[in-house]
Amino acid sequence: MLRLCIALSALTAVSWAQSCGIPASEAKDFLAVHNKLRASISAGTYVAKGRKMPAAKTPIQPMTWDCAIEKSAQAVANTCVFAHSQGRQNLGENLYTMWSSNKVSFTGMGKKASDSWEKEFQDFGWSDVKLTPTGFSSGIGHATQMAWAKSTKLGCGMKLCDGDKKVLVVCQYRDA
Protein backbone atom coordinates (compact mmCIF):
# COMPACT_ATOMS: atom_id res chain seq x y z
CA MET A 1 0.00 0.00 0.00
CA LEU A 2 2.84 2.38 0.89
CA ARG A 3 4.44 1.76 -2.51
CA LEU A 4 1.14 2.58 -4.24
CA CYS A 5 0.92 5.85 -2.31
CA ILE A 6 4.46 6.73 -3.35
CA ALA A 7 3.65 6.02 -7.00
CA LEU A 8 0.51 8.15 -6.81
CA SER A 9 2.34 11.00 -5.12
CA ALA A 10 4.98 10.84 -7.87
CA LEU A 11 2.27 11.35 -10.47
CA THR A 12 0.72 14.16 -8.43
CA ALA A 13 4.07 15.95 -8.18
CA VAL A 14 4.19 16.16 -11.97
CA SER A 15 1.01 18.21 -12.07
CA TRP A 16 2.49 20.75 -9.66
CA ALA A 17 5.55 21.52 -11.80
CA GLN A 18 5.72 25.27 -11.91
CA SER A 19 8.50 26.56 -14.08
CA CYS A 20 10.06 29.93 -13.50
CA GLY A 21 11.68 30.35 -16.89
CA ILE A 22 11.81 27.25 -19.05
CA PRO A 23 8.57 26.13 -20.73
CA ALA A 24 6.23 24.62 -18.12
CA SER A 25 5.69 21.57 -20.34
CA GLU A 26 9.42 20.84 -20.20
CA ALA A 27 9.53 21.21 -16.41
CA LYS A 28 6.65 18.71 -16.22
CA ASP A 29 8.54 16.32 -18.52
CA PHE A 30 11.69 16.51 -16.38
CA LEU A 31 9.67 15.72 -13.27
CA ALA A 32 7.61 12.99 -14.94
CA VAL A 33 10.65 10.97 -16.05
CA HIS A 34 12.53 11.51 -12.78
CA ASN A 35 9.53 10.60 -10.62
CA LYS A 36 8.55 7.56 -12.69
CA LEU A 37 12.09 6.20 -12.25
CA ARG A 38 12.08 6.98 -8.52
CA ALA A 39 8.66 5.36 -7.98
CA SER A 40 9.61 2.18 -9.83
CA ILE A 41 12.89 1.81 -7.92
CA SER A 42 11.10 2.47 -4.64
CA ALA A 43 8.44 -0.14 -5.44
CA GLY A 44 10.94 -2.75 -6.63
CA THR A 45 9.43 -2.86 -10.14
CA TYR A 46 12.34 -1.32 -12.07
CA VAL A 47 13.90 -3.60 -14.69
CA ALA A 48 17.47 -3.02 -15.90
CA LYS A 49 19.51 -5.26 -18.16
CA GLY A 50 16.61 -7.70 -18.27
CA ARG A 51 16.31 -8.24 -14.53
CA LYS A 52 14.08 -6.81 -11.85
CA MET A 53 16.15 -4.65 -9.55
CA PRO A 54 15.81 -4.73 -5.77
CA ALA A 55 13.48 -2.26 -4.11
CA ALA A 56 14.93 0.70 -2.27
CA LYS A 57 15.48 0.02 1.43
CA THR A 58 13.41 3.09 2.31
CA PRO A 59 10.70 4.79 0.22
CA ILE A 60 11.99 7.28 -2.34
CA GLN A 61 9.97 10.49 -2.29
CA PRO A 62 9.02 12.23 -5.54
CA MET A 63 10.99 15.27 -6.63
CA THR A 64 9.46 18.72 -6.75
CA TRP A 65 10.43 21.67 -8.92
CA ASP A 66 12.50 24.40 -7.29
CA CYS A 67 12.67 27.81 -8.97
CA ALA A 68 15.89 28.85 -7.21
CA ILE A 69 17.60 25.69 -8.45
CA GLU A 70 16.16 26.27 -11.94
CA LYS A 71 17.71 29.75 -11.89
CA SER A 72 21.09 28.29 -10.89
CA ALA A 73 20.90 25.62 -13.62
CA GLN A 74 19.86 28.24 -16.18
CA ALA A 75 22.92 30.35 -15.33
CA VAL A 76 25.12 27.34 -16.12
CA ALA A 77 23.22 26.56 -19.35
CA ASN A 78 23.58 30.19 -20.45
CA THR A 79 27.36 29.72 -20.71
CA CYS A 80 26.87 27.19 -23.55
CA VAL A 81 29.85 25.28 -22.11
CA PHE A 82 29.39 21.52 -21.73
CA ALA A 83 31.22 21.21 -18.41
CA HIS A 84 30.14 20.79 -14.82
CA SER A 85 29.90 24.08 -13.00
CA GLN A 86 32.12 25.10 -10.12
CA GLY A 87 30.87 26.25 -6.73
CA ARG A 88 27.46 24.57 -6.93
CA GLN A 89 27.01 24.72 -3.15
CA ASN A 90 25.80 21.18 -2.49
CA LEU A 91 23.90 20.80 -5.73
CA GLY A 92 24.21 17.66 -7.83
CA GLU A 93 24.29 18.28 -11.57
CA ASN A 94 23.53 16.50 -14.84
CA LEU A 95 24.39 17.80 -18.32
CA TYR A 96 22.94 16.91 -21.71
CA THR A 97 23.59 18.37 -25.12
CA MET A 98 22.23 17.75 -28.60
CA TRP A 99 23.57 19.07 -31.90
CA SER A 100 21.98 19.23 -35.32
CA SER A 101 22.85 20.62 -38.72
CA ASN A 102 19.43 22.32 -38.54
CA LYS A 103 18.02 24.58 -35.88
CA VAL A 104 16.86 22.80 -32.73
CA SER A 105 14.25 23.79 -30.17
CA PHE A 106 13.44 23.09 -26.55
CA THR A 107 10.43 20.98 -27.49
CA GLY A 108 10.79 17.54 -25.93
CA MET A 109 14.18 18.29 -24.35
CA GLY A 110 12.98 17.58 -20.80
CA LYS A 111 12.06 14.03 -21.75
CA LYS A 112 15.03 13.46 -24.10
CA ALA A 113 17.62 14.56 -21.55
CA SER A 114 16.01 12.66 -18.67
CA ASP A 115 15.55 9.51 -20.77
CA SER A 116 19.23 9.61 -21.79
CA TRP A 117 20.33 9.77 -18.15
CA GLU A 118 17.92 7.01 -17.09
CA LYS A 119 19.24 4.84 -19.96
CA GLU A 120 22.50 4.43 -18.02
CA PHE A 121 20.63 2.08 -15.67
CA GLN A 122 19.29 0.19 -18.70
CA ASP A 123 22.78 -0.14 -20.18
CA PHE A 124 24.75 -0.91 -17.02
CA GLY A 125 22.30 -1.85 -14.24
CA TRP A 126 23.61 -1.73 -10.69
CA SER A 127 24.77 -4.34 -8.24
CA ASP A 128 23.66 -2.77 -4.97
CA VAL A 129 21.19 -0.12 -3.86
CA LYS A 130 24.04 1.51 -1.92
CA LEU A 131 26.17 3.62 -4.25
CA THR A 132 29.88 2.85 -4.11
CA PRO A 133 32.74 4.56 -5.98
CA THR A 134 32.97 1.45 -8.19
CA GLY A 135 29.25 1.59 -8.95
CA PHE A 136 29.40 5.31 -9.71
CA SER A 137 32.33 4.89 -12.11
CA SER A 138 30.53 2.06 -13.95
CA GLY A 139 28.68 4.57 -16.13
CA ILE A 140 25.58 5.23 -14.04
CA GLY A 141 26.49 8.62 -12.55
CA HIS A 142 23.69 10.60 -14.21
CA ALA A 143 21.05 7.98 -13.47
CA THR A 144 22.05 7.78 -9.82
CA GLN A 145 21.60 11.54 -9.55
CA MET A 146 17.99 11.10 -10.70
CA ALA A 147 17.33 8.27 -8.24
CA TRP A 148 19.26 9.59 -5.22
CA ALA A 149 16.75 9.17 -2.40
CA LYS A 150 17.89 12.20 -0.41
CA SER A 151 17.49 14.54 -3.39
CA THR A 152 13.96 15.89 -3.52
CA LYS A 153 14.38 19.24 -5.28
CA LEU A 154 14.99 19.61 -9.01
CA GLY A 155 15.57 22.58 -11.28
CA CYS A 156 16.73 22.60 -14.89
CA GLY A 157 17.83 25.19 -17.41
CA MET A 158 18.15 25.04 -21.19
CA LYS A 159 19.95 27.23 -23.71
CA LEU A 160 20.08 27.23 -27.50
CA CYS A 161 23.69 27.72 -28.59
CA ASP A 162 25.80 27.86 -31.76
CA GLY A 163 23.21 29.56 -33.94
CA ASP A 164 20.40 27.50 -32.41
CA LYS A 165 21.97 24.27 -33.71
CA LYS A 166 22.86 23.01 -30.25
CA VAL A 167 20.90 22.83 -27.02
CA LEU A 168 22.54 22.54 -23.62
CA VAL A 169 20.44 21.15 -20.77
CA VAL A 170 21.54 21.44 -17.15
CA CYS A 171 19.64 19.89 -14.24
CA GLN A 172 20.63 20.45 -10.65
CA TYR A 173 19.52 18.52 -7.58
CA ARG A 174 19.32 19.37 -3.88
CA ASP A 175 18.91 17.11 -0.90
CA ALA A 176 15.90 17.54 1.33
Predicted stretch roles:
Residues 3, 14-176:
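Mature extracellular or exoplasmic CAP/SCP-family domains and secreted bioactive peptides
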